Amino acid sequence: MNKINIFLFSLIFGCFSMFAQNKPNIVLILSDDQSYTDYSFMGHPAIKTPHLDKLASESALFRRGYVPTALCRPALMTLATGLYSHQNLITGNDPANTPANKAHTEKSGKSAKEMLISNIDRVGSLAKWLGNGGYVSHQSGKWWEGSFQRGGFTEGMTRGYPEKGGRHGDDGLKIGREGMTPVFNFIDKSVADQKPFFLWYAPFLPHTPHNPPERLLKKYTADGRPLAVAKYYAMCEWLDETIGELMKHINDKGIRENTLVIYVTDNGWIQADKGGYKIRSKRSPYEGGTRNPIIFSWPGTVKVADRPELCTSLDIVPTILAAAGVKGPHDFPGLDLMPKLKSGETIERDTIYGESFAHDIADIQNPNASLLYRWVIKGNHKLLLTYDGEPGAMKYTAQSGDAQLYDLKADPQENNNLASENPEMVQQLTKLLNQWYVPEGRTAGKISQKESSKKERKKNK
């Protein structure tokens, strides 16, 4: 190689290295089935989360964070695409055995599961868009949309459907519970190759099975609380320990200053004394299902603040893309928060939206078929409307079609329905919901007359 070629190679390689260094690494941490109250930094009197406490203290912390749909797969698909469930068509965890879905499969020659997964091909994904911008990426933990490659990740753990066990993570579900080696190896390789990386860390924690290490369980059974509750509390601390390991590795590699770390939960979970979860938590449109703290941490770039504004998980994708200098293909419904995270200025938004559907999808091409609730929060007030979608195998369904209006500041448990006393506010907030979108074929204020079978109810306990 002559001197000119050596010079050109060095120049090009040097420019690429500078390009890589200017792009932040991105770490998205997703906990699984955890209440917004169940952290030390959120005021829980018993659960210890020292590593998340430290992260929150170094971050922009949104205590009023929300996911628009409080169920595993829809929540994760929103984080993968930046879109609402009614936009990306992943409204539930699995396709239901319905005439509509049978008709779709007969026409296409594909299974309903495959047709559902194909939505990730149609709308694209955060990993794909970041890949177009020069990122390498790794999937670990929960992932429903086929293999990690199909999700646009360059590396990963999940084999996915139609592989055996490939419903929602298979080998990926080992991360955290069985160590952190795959994640650490990916980080080490990315740093050695001088490539910016995106890490999807979605451990199956504190999700069931609640089988924490005995050393943690002993801490929480000592006070005489019910065993099911003690196990859940210990699982929350176990999750925290894995996050501590991850953050230590990032610090030890000397890349913390150039790494944007984001934390969010897929949905809430209020632990019942005898096992399982309470009604107004996972799957529900209430605070116990949809609310969770959202954290953005990037030392020297994101201003440390305890932020009072509303935040939604829909903001995460556009914010990540902006930080990475990558343009996505959609007009995302969420906000790019990066300018306000850097400046510390107030986010000029006081309204966010959400929707809840049946656990199983009645019509994989029509999201409204399974629509059960829509909600809007404006300031401190929340309006919740019911709809007459097919409940399928829902564990809990609405008992009434009455509008529900709550003052979340005065009544965070949503016990006092103010709708009858404030018809004008109900009307105003209903108008906002219909400006958001009108669900064709569904009627607000009604509930489905269809009953789920005993077999379906047992399946989803």
Regions found by a protein language model. Name each.
Residues 47, 151, 248-305, 311-312, ...:
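Histidine-centered active-site microenvironments of extracellular/periplasmic hydrolases
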Residues 45-48, 66-71, 95-98, 115-124, ...:
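A short beta-strand-to-alpha-helix junction
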Residues 17, 269-274, 302, 309, ...:
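C-terminal cap/loop subdomain of S1 sulfatases and analogous C-terminal strand-loop tails that border
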